[in-house]
A protein has these predicted regions:
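Short amphipathic alpha-helical segments and helix-helix/interface helices
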Residues: 34-38, 97-101, 148-150, 183-190
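C-terminal domain-boundary segment and adjacent tail
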Residues: 74, 104-121, 160-239, 249, ...
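A Trp-anchored, charged/polar loop motif used as the substrate-binding/catalytic surface
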Residues: 31, 133-150
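C-terminal beta-strand-rich structural cap/linker in extracellular carbohydrate-active enzymes
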Residues: 273-301
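Metal-dependent polysaccharide deacetylase catalytic core of the NodB/CE4 family, i.e.
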Residues: 2-97, 103-107, 112-130, 156-169
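Glycan-association/targeting regions that enable binding to alpha-glucans and other polysaccharides
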Residues: 231-233, 240-243, 250, 292-295, ...
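Non-membrane alpha-helical structural segments and their capping/turn regions in soluble enzymes
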Residues: 59-67, 139-142, 176-179, 183
């Protein structure tokens, strides 16, 4: 209805089975299986590892909870898994867990800390905004559809909302919102954010921040008629799935009448977003060359 992609965190040891985790309020519900997870991937959602057992991860269980779980989940969904989501609480964000996440090829880890994420923040401690009917004792704070939105706008932060199973009535009001509350949240994000909202799965956002952090721009030419750049990727981690970037560049006013960009000698349309400012999005690989100018014949040698 709203076009928001979701993200599912999988307890891999119970993939496709009826949930049986301690005294969980969600016991008795069935976990999705591989085919169902593949279906939501085709719908634009994402999938992350929520450990094998949903218990405290010790040094002895790192391989099972992180490596084996990742391998089994990737086989089930026929896609890479780059995100770990801490089960239980931030106990499973301990140093030995995050070190193993890096070792086993994850690109980020999601905590239970209720806070914004900013472009410069550590990607192995991603914060999430809880969408809960109300908080547990002694706080009892009620659901707020505006939670963290205005602060994100002010500080250029990004938000990951999380809930468990938003039905008509929350199964566990300290861990979930209702379906109506989730709809309120979506409506509020769109009304407050307007055209500035980028609705994406975490893998896309992680990829974007990693691409930005590891991109280096080299100026090859900067004349009255042409700007020529080379873009290098410096030590980009292996396995970044999405490799496009959006650029804004200031140019002379005369270049804005019919703006054109050339990426490795291929013409690309650009958009005038403000006076003397062009915007364009392109896939990025190491060493690509970007030319901007008024020459209708393309890049000059």
């Amino acid at each position: 209805q709203f076009g928001f992609p979701g993200h599912v965190e999988v307890v891999v040891g119970q993939l496709g089975d009826v949930r049986r985790i301690g005294a969980s309020s969600y016991n008795g519900y069935r976990h999705m299986n591989g085919e169902e997870l593949q279906d939501i991937l085709r719908r634009g959602w994402g999938v992350g590892n929520h450990s094998w057992t949903h218990t405290i991860i010790t040094h002895e269980t790192l391989d099972l909870e992180l490596r084996q779980a990742k391998d089994k989940l990737e086989q089930a969904i026929e896609a890479s898994v780059i995100l770990f989501c801490s089960p239980g609480d931030n106990t499973n964000m301990a140093a030995h867990v995050l070190e193993a996440c890096r070792k086993f090829g994850y690109l980020g880890a999601m905590s239970l800390t209720d806070a914004l994420n900013r472009p410069e923040d550590e990607l192995f401690w991603i914060n999430r905004t809880a969408l809960h009917d109300h908080y547990y004792a002694p706080f009892f704070s009620a659901f707020d559809p505006y939670r963290n939105i205005l602060y994100a706008k002010k500080t250029r932060g990004w938000i990951i909302d999380y809930c468990h199973c938003p039905l008509e009535t929350p199964i566990h009001p300290n861990k979930d919102c209702s379906a109506d509350q989730l709809q309120q949240r979506f409506e509020t994000i769109l009304s407050e954010g307007g055209d500035s909202v980028w609705c994406a799965v975490p893998e896309e956002v992680l990829s974007y921040h990693l691409m930005r952090r590891h991109s280096r721009v080299e100026t090859l030419k900067h004349s009255a008629t042409q700007h020529h750049y080379r873009l290098n990727l410096d030590k980009l981690p292996h396995g970044v799935p999405y490799r496009s970037l959006t650029f804004e560049v200031q140019v002379p006013a005369a270049w804005c009448r019919d703006p054109k960009i050339w990426i490795n000698n291929q013409a690309l349309a650009a958009t005038l977003v403000r006076p003397k400012t062009l915007r364009f999005t392109t896939d990025v690989e190491n060493g690509i060359e970007i030319v901007i100018g008024e020459d209708r014949n393309g890049p000059s040698e």
